[in-house]
C-alpha cells in the first residue's frame, strides 16, 4: 500500500494534514515534495495527523524535522497528532519533543498550534 497524505484544512492560521502508511524510505519519497509544499511552504502552524502511520524510519523522521525547522524560523509549530507509542518513544529518545510537539487529541493539537514554536539552541 503506498503512503499518501490528505490536506484536511488549509486556513489563514493553520495547516492540517493526515498521513497514511509507512514513512520508510519509499513512503517518504512518495509524499516528500507535496507534503513539504503543503506544510512548510505555507508558513503556518501545522498539525500532522500520523494516527495511521505505523512506522517511521530515519528518512521519515528527517522529513518531519525538515518541515519543523522550516516553520520554526517563522515561530510556527509542528504538531504530530496521535502518534503510536513507538513513534512517541522515538521522538522522546531523539530529544525532538521541542521541535516536533506531540498531541494525543485534535483539541490539544489546536491549542498547541496557537503557541509560538520554541527555537532550538545548539551548543
What are these regions (language model features)?
Residues 104-123:
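A charged, well-structured terminal subsegment
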Residues 1-18:
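Short beta-strand/loop segment at the start of cytosolic alpha/beta domains
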Residues 6-8, 81, 101-103:
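General small-molecule cofactor/ligand-binding pocket signal
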Amino acid at each position: 500500500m503506498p503512503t499518501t497524505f490528505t490536506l484536511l484544512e488549509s486556513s489563514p492560521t493553520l495547516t492540517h494534514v493526515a498521513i497514511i502508511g509507512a514513512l520508510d524510505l519509499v513512503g517518504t519519497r512518495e509524499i516528500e515534495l507535496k507534503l513539504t509544499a503543503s506544510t512548510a511552504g505555507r508558513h503556518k502552524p501545522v498539525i500532522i495527523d500520523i494516527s495511521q502511520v505505523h512506522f517511521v524510519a530515519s528518512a521519515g523522521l528527517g522529513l518531519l524535522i525538515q518541515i519543523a525547522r522550516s516553520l520554526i524560523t517563522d515561530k510556527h509549530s509542528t504538531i504530530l497528532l496521535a502518534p503510536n507509542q513507538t513513534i512517541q518513544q522515538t521522538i522522546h529518545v531523539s530529544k525532538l519533543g521541542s521541535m516536533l510537539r506531540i498531541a494525543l487529541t485534535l483539541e490539544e493539537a489546536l491549542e498547541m498550534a496557537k503557541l509560538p514554536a520554541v527555537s532550538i539552541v545548539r551548543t
